[in-house]
């Protein structure tokens, strides 16, 4: 009898824990979405201090989109001192997670030696190629620009370097 009661209690406890976790996950997702929306609105209004205060904690928690947008603030010097090295660090973290915009941005930086010395066309080609594959229809304008930039970078690579970059693209896996 005690075993049956314990099994029932354990089952109820497991269901309750699952419900609590689902509610927490849903609440967190809504909170994240709301923070991203508020930060984007603040950024558009040029309230960079508010955008920074919302994106920075999310970036520190590993949110790829927040890392990319914060990187853009450092790239432009909007609300923070202009710092291409910090922008590159943030873009690379987000790019490694598979975020297409960050992949393009870090590829651009590698291709032009901005914030990432030295210039590295092989890395530029790899990251821009990954971005092209990751851009959605919503980002068609960015994708078209990335295709042009990849062609520019490719023109500076030898056949061997180009082959190595293609192998790197095929072998690439996002970090979690």
What are the roles of these predicted feature ranges?
Residues 13-23:
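Bacterial N-terminal signal peptides
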Residues 35-42, 54-58, 69-76, 105-112, ...:
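Hydrophobic face of amphipathic alpha-helices that form TPR/SEL1-like repeat modules
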Residues 32, 141-176:
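Terminal, low-structured helical/coil segments at or just beyond the last alpha-helical repeat
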